[in-house]
Amino acid sequence: MHLSSWVGDYNVHRMLVDNGSSANILYYLAFQQMEINRAQLTPTNAPLVGFEGTRVFPLGAITLSVTVGDYPQQIIQDVTFLVVDCSFAYNSILGRPTLNSWKAATSTYHLMIKFPTEYGIGKLRGDQVAAR
């Protein structure tokens, strides 16, 4: 599922919601466009293993505030992303750890994520055109 949300001070488009991913990924090109100093990355040495079994070593990890949903039914949460320098059609991937912490229910059929908030059920709608 493809969506947009606020990450730090930036409205990040082309975010992939991946229930199968065990990590949150921010691709280096998006990281650079956010004008974050590379010195803010926390070193990490654990490789990521892709679908084909290929290994990718992250440049580091960074924790950024992510805002999803429409006020007042929104979540604002610090999310740790692994920054990876490789090409991909998306700017970032939101993985299972974040979705679980939001208690989110995803529906690929409806291109929607629902999550509980203090003020009722929040909703995120995916981009149908981009999903094709």
Predicted regions and their residues:
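A short acidic-Thr-Gly-centered motif at the start of a beta-strand
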Residues: M1-N11, G69
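Conserved catalytic motifs of the protein kinase core domain
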Residues: N11-V12, A89
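Short hydrophobic beta-strand that contains or immediately precedes a catalytic carboxylate
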Residues: M15-V17
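Aspartic protease core domain of the pepsin/retropepsin superfamily
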Residues: N19, A23-R132
